[in-house]
Amino acid sequence: KTMYDFRPIVVLDDARTREIIEFIKNENLTYLDDNLCYTEEYRGYSIAVMRHVDLGHLCGYIDLAEENINEKQYNLLDRLAHGGITHYINNEIGFDCGHCYDIMPYSCFNNLFCSGKYRDFNYVLNNLKEMVDALVESKGGQLQCG
């Protein structure tokens, strides 16, 4: 799937569903590239917002490069990340917005979680920046690699 062929599995015929679908189309066109990804450098870290191809929710990632974080820092980031850390592989740490209380736009299960909330691009980007800020502050305000 690309940003141009948004096809939810189930389309409920109601105003809220139509509004969310239109919002996501605009969000993809405004922020995300052809791979449904947005990246930027923030305070010395590469951060990324990506759309899950199958379920449609957004995920956020921080590239720690060669940096190691300790248990205290991991726990801090886990508390700040939406729904907790769900990804930590090869010095990349991240979270997703596909929990039971979130709207997963391409999912056929949305009708079961109709009281959920769609976590938009700005929500994910701000959550990533909050995590990076906390990580930098946990090191005395200076980046320390290695």
Place the predicted regions along the sequence by residue:
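N-terminal low-complexity, intrinsically disordered segments
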Residues: 2-69
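Polybasic, proline/glycine-rich intrinsically disordered low-complexity segments
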Residues: 28-31, 38, 45, 69-146
